[in-house]
Regions:
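Sequence/structural signature of beta-propeller domains
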Residues: 1-224
Length: 224
């Protein structure tokens, strides 16, 4: 996730479960360890030094305060469990993104079935909204969801799929563009092997992270 206040990126790692801060070139600035094995899958900046984290196995969202002096991940200020469509412990929440509304937070379920859930988040809490399931931006050919990002500046939702090797860019009103993550497209010399996270900034720079420890940066050209 992109933090526009610090102008740095934040990501999560598993085994050990940690939050990692990176600069725009992918250099690690600090590692913030957690107090156990939490199976972190996604992180989203909410503003005001607040972050939402998703835990795949537990189907849980938690909020944490992280500032420039944080060295160990503090206890969650709030948590929410969405126990929906539990078919596999390894097919849970894979992406988080702030939505169009001031307090909207979108949560992506990886597969079985593919789905976006919409929650309402206040400064101290998360709660499920009345319109729980959002289907508008999930094309039929998508095999999984491995990351999610909403660009509020342009009103675009980015849905990342490592099994389909694409990013689907949607305006939530029906317009859609597909970005291939295979060799020969967008300056890629090799396929992105396992894309797991996506973010962008206010300058139209797009970042994708992939296992094993790969970092990609895409910048807009005059013709794109």
């Amino acid at each position: 996730t992109w933090n526009p206040d610090s102008r740095t990126l934040f990501a999560v790692t598993d085994h050990p479960s940690s939050v990692v801060e990176l600069d725009t070139e992918g250099n690690v600035l600090r590692v913030i360890p957690s107090d156990g094995d939490h199976d972190f899958e996604a992180i989203e900046y909410l503003g005001g030094n607040r972050y939402a984290l998703s835990r795949e196995r537990e189907r849980t969202l938690t909020t944490h305060c992280i500032d420039s002096s944080t060295t160990v991940l503090p206890p969650a200020t709030y948590s929410l469990t969405l126990d929906v469509n539990r078919h596999s412990d390894n097919a849970g929440f894979e992406g988080l993104a702030q939505g169009r509304g001031e307090h909207a937070l979108m949560v992506a379920q990886e597969k079985k079935p593919l789905r976006l859930y919409v929650t309402d988040q206040s400064p101290d809490a998360l709660s499920v909204s009345d319109s729980l399931t959002h289907r508008a931006s999930l094309p039929w050919f998508l095999k999984d969801i491995s990351g999610l990002h909403y660009d509020r500046n342009n009103g675009l939702l980015y849905v990342l799929s490592h099994e389909s090797d694409v990013v689907v860019v949607s305006d939530l009103d029906g317009g859609r563009k597909v970005m291939s993550l295979r060799r020969g497209h967008y300056g890629l010399r090799r396929d992105i092997p396992q894309a797991e996270g996506i973010a962008s900034d206010d300058r139209d720079t797009l970042w994708i992270v992939s296992e094993p420890n790969l970092f990609y940066r895409f910048t807009r050209t005059a013709s794109s």
